[in-house]
């Protein structure tokens, strides 16, 4: 199965920005907040392995990998939500995370879902 070709106007990761405007485009309509929320827990094995890494200092690769995967999953869910709202871009994108229990972390990715049009002359 092949993916259908995307419209040049379709929402893709390159149309997501932390800025309040998408460069080279004018915001035509704000559609509301798009968000993706992921709740992850650490396994007993992962927690033990990470505890061993803390003895030696430096980057705790097990937690780094878990955080990267959680952020990417939250980002993907935010894109899905923005598409559902009819957006072709997301501006003012942010991440936040909170530990909601022992070893349980919530990661949220959110931004303003918008419809944009290329600036005149583009």
From Swiss-Prot:
Q: Which Pfam families match?
A: YbjQ_1 (PF01906)
Which InterPro entries does this one have?
UPF0145_dom_sf (IPR035439), UPF0145_YbjQ-like (IPR002765)
* Origin superkingdom: Bacteria
Q: Which PANTHER family does the protein's record reference?
A: UPF0145 PROTEIN SCO3412, UPF0145 PROTEIN YBJQ
Q: Which family does the similarity line name? A: Belongs to the UPF0145 family.
What protein name applies here?
A: UPF0145 protein Bmul_3577/BMULJ_04940
- Organism of origin is Burkholderia multivorans (strain ATCC 17616 / 249)
